[in-house]
Amino acid sequence: MSTTAHELFHQLQYDLSHGNDAAEQALFWLEEGSADYVGALVAEQCGGKSLHKWEQDTMFDLRRAQETVNAKELVHCSPQRRMQLMEKKYHSYQLADAMVICLVQKQAKGTELAAIVRYFQALADTRSGEEAFSQAFGMTHAQFLQEFQQWYVQERHLPFAAHVIARPGVSAALAADVKTQAAAVQPMLAGMYGQRLCGRYDLILAADAADFIQAIAENCAVTQDKARELATGSLWIQDGSTIIVQAGELGDGKQRIFSVGALCARLLETQVADKREESVAWLDRGMIYLAGIRALEQAGQGRYADYRRGWQQAVRRAGAVPSLEQLLTADGMREASESCGDDIVNELAEFAADELMTRFGWSSYRAYLQQVRRLGSEREAFREVYGRDTAAYARELELARTSRR
């Protein structure tokens, strides 16, 4: 629905401006960003993604972007330059959306769309995008660009804020506790990862397994069957800036602290390095679980060293355990859990991640995530930072596991 509305608004832009909407002297960012804005408005009116979520998801995408164009590059564009800017790596359309989000926030409530319409009407009489902008919005385009840059920097570095939404059957006390725990772990995570989690997130708490599936279907625009598939074996599902949590599995206070710590660690890792190929799934899971354990220690729920002894003893006393090479992918992790049990798979991931941090230091994981961001491959980043491939480390770990019984 949003795509259809986007294209229809382009036609309206053309009609209002007498064909000047896409002229090189018009404002490219306002042409494309306003079409996305109208698409989001229509989607919301038709029961789809809300305008609020569209705005939050736009900034979520831009925070993860490895590179973006400068806003000034989206002012006047030749047809050839437009084609270049369509490459996803530039995130041109998301930045144009952000510029429109900033612009409409400056308009009186209820007048936002009318002001955009005035701009395209003004283009019918003047080919200058800047002049039409001044007529429609009561400020110079240069002034807006300056204010946008300030707004954009603030938005990109906005400290983490969680809007916790309790679905029916979830107590207000539980929702308040989740919000408190999510805020409490932020300084610890910033110390671990060398940067802080930024942005606004909606944390939707589902009451039980059935409600979890329903919440996924409602908020992720997927079918019930797809929602059921996503929910299987998951404590949470992420869709951009929206996190849906199976609150019925959060358990007591201790489990809640661990789970919220792990969840926030995952969000921060996604912010640092999201586009990943050639996964190292055991390291992904192991590290967010270690973050959860650090959160427990911070909350006075045991010492990290004691938890470490627990997983060390578990994997050393176990008979056959999966090889780390079996745990490189999400499918491999799932198959290992089905054959060996969730506990030993999780303990092995914790053991492997902790051994790596013991040898190379926690700062090595920051370097690893930066290399993942640069290279796009987790396994290549692993070789780059740790000086061995995952297969070699798997052999080293198995020797360490069996030689210390």
What do these predicted regions represent?
Residues 21-101, 105-160, 275-351, 355-362, ...:
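Acidic/His/Gly-enriched intrinsically disordered linker/tail segments
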Residues 1-23, 27, 38, 128-129, ...:
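Juxtacatalytic substrate-recognition/specificity segment
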